[in-house]
Structure formats: structure tokens, C-alpha cells
Regions:
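Short aromatic/hydrophobic contact patches that present stacked aromatics
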Residues: 8, 13, 139-141, 222, ...
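Terminal RNA-binding accessory module
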Residues: 329, 337-436
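Flexible glycine-/small-residue-rich
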Residues: 225, 255-257, 326, 377-379, ...
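Conserved, mostly hydrophobic/aromatic
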Residues: 170, 187, 223, 253, ...
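Proteins enriched for Cys/Gly/acidic motifs involved in redox and nucleic-acid/cofactor modification
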Residues: 1-195, 210, 247, 251, ...
């Protein structure tokens, strides 16, 4: 009997990338490959890459160099696949799989094992690809691409095509997941707000969310990132959809800066004022909603005054989650051609904003101490877990909770008393199981 070839998949980046890795895994299994949890046992390694941040790309590049030195056959997938020159400079024999060609990964592995270094960039029909299920969480892409032309963004270059999945396809994936005991559906996208564009069917994001929530079963839905211009355009119907009991009371709206001037120079398709307005309406209609946002610190044209406006925005809005990135010039973007700010200034500003955000997040989370909340257990932690809890879960507001004393099954709802908190989440003590 011939032993199956073993493949190790390493994933970087957002939930959309993680969803692509799910597809890669399923495709490899169907092609007869065996997946392994360590590169040590692998005949080949697939790196599903991310290029949003320069630091991440540098980390991946170093990883590629190490694997190349160890003579490991490599397949490079994800957004970094657009930078063939860099990949081939590190490893001329690596196979490259574009973001539209991920089901070609089995062929690419054969190619990498032969050392041919072929580039696969054909466009595939992703509608026909199944979605692997790993209960209790299932990632489902609803659309790809975006309508923006941000001057700092390389993802648009790596994923240039705009398309939406048919609603019947998405609903079928949801139904299949629920049948296999999925409890959390994560809807992934570069920008969920573009959903419906390009489809002959007249449907938009709020309508899709409502249709998903009509599916029978005990589950929750987490909506992926939506840019401010689309959140503003569909604000009222979006709020109505988020109010459904099956929707996590959570929204991720990246504003990127608190300066109107910098926002315009980034070529963002919204204003900072739009962001203030959206958050205000969201909190009035859904008072307990968790607000997440993204900030880029140190954009080339950002002045000290611009940065202080960003600090004021965070202090005023007080988001529950702030993802802070130090600006890094990305290949092929307009912002890369601009005169860059000194590294020390960017580091100093980033550290200051991070401290402001941590204080806000910590104080907001501390308000939960003493409260009893419903938590869906989603994950078991290794080595007795973070904060001493064996399991972690999510509240209806998508707050992460480390749960002490839980002995049940992943996917169960439990009542938890919050006994501690930090900027990253909550710490709870089990009270009893509950039915939702």
C-alpha cells in the first residue's frame, strides 16, 4: 500500500484567508492527501499568506527562507501570490497559487515536489466548491473584492475581482453546517457591504442576513468587516438585521483615521463624520452592540495634529475593539511612492494610541464584572487555557470569555458569572448550563 503524501498548511491573516485554507484542506483531502499538524511530518508545506501589514509579509518571507533552507517543497497561496518576484527570489522552485485558483493546490503540490515552480492563476468557479465543517465554528465567504481604491491597500491588487456568492449557495452551506452541529457562522468578506453587487438576483447584505437567520437551528452569526460608506448606505435595514436574536451584536467598521484630511488623502470612500454618525445610530438602536474598528497610524501625510484627531476619535467613540496597524508601504500602492514618516515617530504614535485603546477596552470590560451572562462555548484552550480557564466562549455581544469550571461539550450555552476582565476579554466562573 502506497502511503499518502502529507501536507502541512500554515495560514496568516483574516477570516477570509482562513476560509480559503478551509477550502484548500477540503480540496487536498479529496485529492488523496493527508493533512498533518506539523511541518516535521510533511512532504510539502502550503503557506496561505497575508500582505496587509509589512511586518506580516516580512515574517512570512523569513518563514519561506527557513523552509527553503531545509529543502521543504513549498506552495505559496493567498495575497502574497501577487508578488511573484519576491517569492521566486526566495525560492525559485516554489509553486504559486493565486487567490482565484485555490483548488489547484493539489496540482501545485505535485509541481512543488517536482521542483517546477509553476504559477497557477486561473479563475475558478468557487460556487461549486464545498465548505468543510469543523464544529462549532464554520467560516462562509459571502463575497470577494471591494469597490474602494484606498491608496495604502495591497489586498485590492491581490484580490481584484468583485463578485458575490449566490444566496441559495450560501444558505445551502449554512444548512449543511447546522446539520453537522455548527453553532457559530462567521460570514467572511473583504467588505461585506458589497454583497449582492454583480448578482442578477436583487439582494443586499441585510436581506441575506435575514434569510440566514430564518434557517432553523440554534446558532449565531458573526458578520465580517463592512466599510463605513456601505454601513451608512444601508444603516437602518442593517440595524434591523443585526437586531435578530441569531445575530451577534457585533459590527466591525474600519475608519482608519480620525482626520478628515488624511481620510481623504487615503482615498477612503467615506468621511470621519460618517463613522461618528453610524456608531451613534447603532448604539441608540442596539445599546449593547460591540463596535470594532481599525486604525492606521503613521500614514505618510499624517501630521501631529492629524494623529491627535485620531486619539480624540478613539476617546470619544470608545470602541470595544481597536485594531491598530503601523503604516507600512505596500508594493504597487500609491502610498508607497510618498515620502514616509520617520519610523520612531510612527512607533511612538502607535504606542500612545495602543495605550489609550487598552485603557478604554479594559474599563469597558470591567463593567461586566459581577454580571451573569450567557456564553456559548466555542473552544478548548491548551495547557489549562488562558486566565486559568479550560474553555473560552462568546457572549451575545461577541465578547470573549475564559470560563472556569466547564466540563461539558463545545457548542453548549452556559450561564457564567464574570469575575475578572482585561482589555482582551472577560474571565468567568460557571454557574450552570442553559438552553437558548
Amino acid at each position: 500500500m502506497i502511503a499518502k503524501r502529507k501536507v502541512y498548511i500554515e495560514t496568516y491573516g483574516c477570516t477570509l484567508n482562513q476560509s480559503d485554507s478551509d477550502i484548500i484542506s477540503l480540496s487536498l483531502k479529496k485529492s488523496g492527501y493527508e493533512l498533518t499538524t506539523s511541518e516535521s511530518f510533511a512532504d510539502a508545506v502550503v503557506i496561505n499568506t497575508c500582505t496587509v501589514k509589512g511586518a506580516t509579509e516580512n515574517k512570512i518571507s523569513e518563514r519561506m527562507k527557513k523552509l527553503t533552507q531545509n529543502k521543504v517543497p513549498l506552495v505559496i497561496a493567498g495575497c502574497m501570490s501577487a508578488n511573484e518576484r519576491l517569492i521566486k527570489k526566495i525560492n525559485p522552485h516554489a509553486a504559486i497559487v493565486g487567490t482565484t485558483s485555490i483548488t489547484s493546490v493539489a496540482e501545485a503540490i505535485n509541481d512543488a515536489l517536482s521542483g517546477n515552480g509553476t504559477v497557477f492563476k486561473n479563475r475558478e468557479d468557487k460556487e461549486t466548491i464545498g465548505r468543510p465543517v469543523s464544529a462549532p465554528i464554520m467560516r462562509i465567504p459571502i463575497c470577494e473584492g471591494c469597490t474602494s481604491r484606498c491608496h495604502f491597500c495591497q489586498t485590492k491588487i491581490a484580490r481584484p475581482f468583485l463578485f458575490s456568492y449566490q444566496p441559495k449557495t450560501i444558505l445551502k452551506w449554512v444548512e449543511d453546517g447546522i446539520k453537522q452541529r455548527v453553532k457559530e457562522i462567521q460570514l467572511t468578506a473583504m467588505d461585506a457591504g458589497v454583497y449582492g453587487m454583480g448578482l442578477e438576483t436583487q439582494i443586499d447584505l441585510p436581506s441575506l442576513l435575514s434569510a440566514i437567520c430564518e434557517t432553523e437551528g440554534d446558532f449565531r452569526v458573526r458578520l465580517g468587516m463592512i466599510n463605513p460608506q456601505h454601513a451608512k448606505r444601508m444603516c437602518e435595514p442593517l440595524i434591523s438585521a443585526l437586531a435578530h436574536e441569531k445575530m451577534y451584536k457585533f459590527i466591525h467598521i474600519p475608519v482608519q483615521t480620525g482626520s478628515e484630511r488624511v481620510c481623504k488623502e487615503m482615498n477612503r470612500q467615506h468621511t470621519v463624520k460618517n463613522f461618528y454618525e453610524i456608531v451613534d445610530v447603532m448604539r441608540k438602536k442596539i445599546p449593547n452592540i460591540t463596535i470594532a474598528t481599525d486604525i492606521i497610524v503613521g500614514y505618510p501625510t499624517e501630521t501631529k495634529e492629524d494623529f491627535e484627531e485620531t486619539v480624540r476619535l478613539i476617546e470619544t467613540i470608545q470602541p470595544d475593539i481597536v485594531n491598530i496597524s503601523k503604516f507600512s508601504p505596500r508594493e504597487g500602492t500609491i502610498a508607497k511612492k510618498m515620502k514616509q514618516l520617520p519610523t520612531q515617530i510612527v512607533k511612538k504614535r502607535s504606542a500612545k494610541l495602543a495605550e489609550v485603546a487598552r485603557q478604554i477596552q479594559t474599563e469597558k470590560n470591567k463593567k461586566f464584572i459581577g454580571k451573569v451572562v450567557h456564553v456559548m462555548i466555542t473552544e478548548r484552550q491548551q495547557q489549562n487555557g488562558r486566565h486559568g480557564g479550560d474553555y473560552t466562549g462568546r457572549t451575545n455581544e461577541y465578547k470573549q470569555v475564559a470560563v472556569k469550571g466547564f466540563k461539558g461539550k463545545i457548542g453548549e450555552w452556559v450561564k457564567v458569572k464574570i469575575i475578572g476582565a482585561n482589555y482582551g476579554g472577560l474571565i468567568g466562573k460557571l454557574k450552570n448550563s442553559c438552553k437558548k
